[in-house]
């Protein structure tokens, strides 16, 4: 099936669908560096580097019949394009452009990704944002269900919960359990941070290079998967740190952050190295446990985390591994940016992305839905029995993954 990707970022969402056999025919992303990353890794896809609010879908020279699905994650920050409007009303946000494209292309399905907080968000008039979203899609002929997925359930070495609004045309049966991809691993076999990055070159602060050789062979299935088709390591450069910062990192133990260090290693006021800063962000400089999935990698992960074993922040490649980007996926633009620079750094691109393995699981589930639409329409078929039967058909047994069959009934909602 053909898809178009709105608010495409660097392409994590699209890449997951590609791994599931979909064909991306168009991506729209206004940030130059993220767009360059997308184009570099998807040379056969038409990428438009423009603000989506300025685009008319009728001018894109894409036939409506060629579009089977639309995916994307419109940013929820601010939820407003006008200062006098309700900032939390999605009808005042970029969300309306997602609806606009869905209305024009009339795809078989759409998937819209967002953060967990959107489910509890209300407007000034006390309406739930999620209800308004469902209503707006209903107005253009779609039913919506909402599922909450955690990336670590799908082989990603990261605990990352995200919300997915899945839309189908109103004449299609919509069942939440059927559209929820089955978990691919049990909790005791989650991919850990150490399993994800332990084969990468050992570097200290300020070391590394844009292209390096692998120092060792893959040590596990995850590393084998990430290294398929890759002959070297890209984007593995560690940031430079002052000695004061390196000493602070050395004082932080697993599970601790900057808030746990002694006064000797506390953050200092900007421009005054002798005065302790009154502001301490507990999420900064956190040293994650190596033998568990990493906590959520956000756009600010360059300062959020330090390596579990070395006294430095993660590299962009380590972040990409944690997000399940393959090593063949090479990031463009600067590694980091200053506050006044307008483009998205490699770290920001990676942290903003939908993990490809998570996207792949969702894409495979949608494919399964359309392949079994006749059975789903049959009211004599037990939904629960059908869901359980489908778990085994969705598995890649060659990768020796395990199934959890009892947890897919409490993380879905429908409208």
UniProtKB/Swiss-Prot annotation:
Pfam families: DNA_methylase. GO terms for biological process: DNA restriction-modification system; methylation; negative regulation of gene expression via chromosomal CpG island methylation. One of its GO terms (molecular function) is DNA (cytosine-5-)-methyltransferase activity. InterPro entries: C5-Methyltransferase, C5_DNA_meth_AS, C5_MeTfrase, C5_meth_CS, SAM-dependent_MTases_sf. Its EC number is 2.1.1.37. Residues 1-373 form the SAM-dependent MTase C5-type domain. Keywords: DNA-binding, Methyltransferase, Restriction system, S-adenosyl-L-methionine, Transferase. The keyword DNA-binding applies. It catalyses: a 2'-deoxycytidine in DNA + S-adenosyl-L-methionine = a 5-methyl-2'-deoxycytidine in DNA + S-adenosyl-L-homocysteine + H(+). CDD domains: Cyt_C5_DNA_methylase. The active site is at residue 76. It comes from the Bacteria. Gene3D superfamilies: DNA Methylase, subunit A, domain 2, Vaccinia Virus protein VP39. Belongs to the class I-like SAM-binding methyltransferase superfamily. C5-methyltransferase family. This is Type II methyltransferase M.DdeI. It comes from Desulfomicrobium norvegicum (strain DSM 1741 / NCIMB 8310).
């Amino acid at each position: 099936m053909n898809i178009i990707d709105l608010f495409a970022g660097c392409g994590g969402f699209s890449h997951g669908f590609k791994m599931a056999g979909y064909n991306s025919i168009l991506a729209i992303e206004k940030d130059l560096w993220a767009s360059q990353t997308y184009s570099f890794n998807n040379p056969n896809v038409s990428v438009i580097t423009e603000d989506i609010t300025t685009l008319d879908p009728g001018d894109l020279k894409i036939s409506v019949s060629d579009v089977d699905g639309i995916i994307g994650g419109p940013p929820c920050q601010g939820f407003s394009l006008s200062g006098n409007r309700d900032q939390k009303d999605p009808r005042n946000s970029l969300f309306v452009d997602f609806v606009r494209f869905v209305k024009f292309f009339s795809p078989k399905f759409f998937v819209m990704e967002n953060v967990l907080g959107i489910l509890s968000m209300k407007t000034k008039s006390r309406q739930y944002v999620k209800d308004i979203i469902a209503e707006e899609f209903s107005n253009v002929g779609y039913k919506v269900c909402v599922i909450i997925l955690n990336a670590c359930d799908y082989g990603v070495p990261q605990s990352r919960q995200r919300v997915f609004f899945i839309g189908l045309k109103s004449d299609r049966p919509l069942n939440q359990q059927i559209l929820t991809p089955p978990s691919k691993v049990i909790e005791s076999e989650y991919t850990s941070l150490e399993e994800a990055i332990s084969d990468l070159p050992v570097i200290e602060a300020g070391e590394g290079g844009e292209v390096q050789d692998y120092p060792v062979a893959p040590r596990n299935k995850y590393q084998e998967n990430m290294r398929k088709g890759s002959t070297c390591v890209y984007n593995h450069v560690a940031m430079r740190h002052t000695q004061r910062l390196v000493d602070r990192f050395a004082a932080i133990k697993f599970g601790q952050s900057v808030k746990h260090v002694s006064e000797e290693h506390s953050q200092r006021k900007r421009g005054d190295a002798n005065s302790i800063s009154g502001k301490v962000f507990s999420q900064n400089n956190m040293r994650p446990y190596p033998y568990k999935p990493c906590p959520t990698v956000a756009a600010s992960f360059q300062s959020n985390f330090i390596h579990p074993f070395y006294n430095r922040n993660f590299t962009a490649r380590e972040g990409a591994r944690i997000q399940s980007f393959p090593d063949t996926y090479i990031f463009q633009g600067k590694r980091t940016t200053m506050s006044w620079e307008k483009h998205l750094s490699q770290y920001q691109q990676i942290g903003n992305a939908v993990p490809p393995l998570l996207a792949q699981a969702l894409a495979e589930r949608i494919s399964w839905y359309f392949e079994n639409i006749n059975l789903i329409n049959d009211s004599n078929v037990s939904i629960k029995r059908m869901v359980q039967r489908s778990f085994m058909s969705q598995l890649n047994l060659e990768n020796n993954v395990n199934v959890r069959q009892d947890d897919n009934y409490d993380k879905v909602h429908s409208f």
